[in-house]
Each structure stands twice: as structure tokens, then as C-alpha cells.
Amino acid sequence: MKNLFSIEGKIAIVTGGSRGIGEMIAAGFLANGAKVYISSRKTEACEATAERLVEEYGGECVSLPADVSRLEGITALVSAVAERESQLDILV
């Protein structure tokens, strides 16, 4: 039963992951063994948050800045993840 809800080894994208609730969700995923991609419109904030989360929780957190309120941003984010991963397990 313990492994039923495990996210260890899962691949997650957290949009709005550079601050607030998104950052907290990303931190929780990292702390529980997921590989996390965070996205936000502000490149510097996204990169700084990814670095800080890795320092604090370990694991792998990748910054993929994108404006997902625009179709171009969504397309860019999907392409960036598809280049790196063969699957996606969690989308927030």
C-alpha cells in the first residue's frame, strides 16, 4: 500500500513553480523523489527557484521558463519537455 501513492521516479511539471503554491508543490514532489520541471513567465525567478529547491531538497529540478497563458508558450514548454523525457506522469 505504501508504494500505491509513491511519486518516486515520476516526472512532474509544475506551472507557476517559481513561487507561492507552485513552489511548495514542486518542493513536495522533490522531497518525495520526483524529477520536477518548473515553469513560470519570469526566467530569472524560475532559474533561481530551481537552484534553491535542489539545494534544499536534492533531486533534480529543471527550470523551463514559459508563458503558458499563450499558445506559443505552451508549445515551447511541451517541446522542451519532450526533448528531455519520454513520458510525463504529473502536470500541475
Sequence positions of predicted segments:
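Aromatic pocket-lining residues of Rossmann-like dinucleotide-binding sites
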Residues: 29
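Flexible N-terminal pre-Rossmann segment of NAD(P)-dependent oxidoreductases
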Residues: 1-13
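A glycine-rich helix->loop->beta "capping" turn
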Residues: 56-60, 80-91
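Conserved glycine-rich Rossmann-like NAD(P)H-binding loop of the short-chain dehydrogenase/reductase
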Residues: 32-49
